[in-house]
């Protein structure tokens, strides 16, 4: 009696569920259409995951991250499969569609990542004013050297992103984007077409301007206190030149900065976490023509 390998035994267990018979009975073209729908779904969702700091490769390891992308893509695969044009798939067209889906995912991930970049810049501003930039550490969220307050803020926002429900807002924006920008739009000259709005460059610059403006507004109270402390230490240096104000300023500014953060941190979190689906899809809708 021939021996049965572990792989054959595994396939026999699957045969009992009927999964293998389902795949065998499926037409060849139909099977490829399901595979192409999965690829297109993973292109948009994987592109968004690649940009959002809380979901990058450095935060979620490779296998777990790819499994998460595939799992979240499964919800969009039937919707994409339903909208496919009839007939045998055109693989050149699907290649262009995959690139288009990745671009849309990158743009959605970019606007979802704005709060993370804002708080990191706020931390850098505060640490620059209190003279603590020498204590920079590596941030797995951005892959760069950031200040201690900056990485504290980014990790705090990352925690709230998962615990506070912002991940649901992010996923809701991703799934809602399929109704705004379908995978199979109207074709121009037989090729898939992704139309940017006429003022797309202005919209991108406006988003960068808003990011810098929010950074300055959020960090302004702490920086003003630091400035007043610097003025006060300057007056002390005028009246008592024998004191080494430079070394005295570092602990004084650090203590004032930490005290201000304790008072001001709830307002910072409320300002940043007031995020709705429209906050992500609104700028994208201005950037792309649906």
Where are these regions (language model features)?
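Hydrophobic alpha-helical segments and their helix-loop boundaries in membrane
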Residues: 10-290
């Amino acid at each position: 009696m021939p021996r049965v390998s572990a792989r054959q035994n595994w396939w026999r267990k699957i045969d009992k569920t009927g999964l293998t018979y389902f795949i065998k009975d499926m037409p060849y073209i139909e099977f490829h259409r399901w595979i192409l729908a999965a690829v297109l779904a993973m292109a948009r969702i994987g592109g968004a995951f690649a940009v959002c700091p809380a979901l990058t490769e450095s935060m979620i390891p490779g296998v777990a991250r790819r499994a998460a992308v595939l799992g979240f893509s499964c919800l969009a695969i039937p919707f994409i499969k339903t909208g496919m044009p009839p007939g045998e798939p055109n693989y050149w067209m699907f290649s262009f569609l995959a690139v288009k889906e990745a671009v849309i995912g990158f743009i959605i991930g970019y606007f979802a990542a704005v709060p993370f970049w804002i708080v990191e810049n706020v931390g850098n501003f505060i640490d620059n004013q209190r003279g603590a930039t020498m204590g920079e550490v590596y941030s797995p969220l951005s892959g760069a050297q950031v200040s201690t307050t900056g990485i504290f803020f980014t990790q705090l926002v990352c925690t709230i992103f998962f615990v506070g429900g912002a991940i649901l807002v992010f996923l809701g924006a991703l799934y809602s984007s399929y109704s705004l920008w379908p995978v199979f739009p109207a074709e121009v000259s037989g090729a898939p077409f992704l139309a940017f709005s006429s003022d797309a460059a202005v919209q991108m610059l406006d988003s960068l301007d808003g990011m810098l403006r929010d950074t300055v507004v959020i960090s302004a109270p702490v920086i003003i206190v630091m400035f007043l402390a610097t003025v006060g230490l300057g007056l002390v240096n005028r009246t008592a030149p024998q004191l080494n104000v430079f070394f005295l300023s570092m602990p004084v500014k650090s203590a004032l900065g930490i005290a201000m953060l304790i008072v001001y941190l709830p307002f910072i979190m409320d300002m940043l976490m007031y995020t709705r689906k429209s906050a992500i899809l609104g700028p994208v809708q201005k950037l792309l023509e649906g």
